[in-house]
């Protein structure tokens, strides 16, 4: 999870890069913040996928077997 203010800082640095450019320290900070953001995003997305169930219009569970296997591993079954 991103700490409060990190997304705002990412956006600030992105806007500054477009308008006036960034110092080397700011470029490094921007890269680190982006990596943290991507890590949090991927973790959140994976968590959502591991809780997903696909159902057809008739109410039958049609979740792909690969996803079911991954969900079992994720839950430790």
From Swiss-Prot:
UniProt biased composition (Basic and acidic residues): 63-77
Places the protein is found: Cytoplasm
Region (Disordered): 53-77
Gene3D superfamilies: Helix hairpin bin (1.10.287.540)
Keywords from the named record: Cytoplasm
The organism's place on the tree of life at top rank: Bacteria
Protein name: UPF0291 protein EAT1b_0405
Originating species: Exiguobacterium sp. (strain ATCC BAA-1283 / AT1b)
Family recorded in the similarity comment: Belongs to the UPF0291 family.
Gene Ontology cellular-component terms listed: cytoplasm
Cytoplasm among keywords: yes
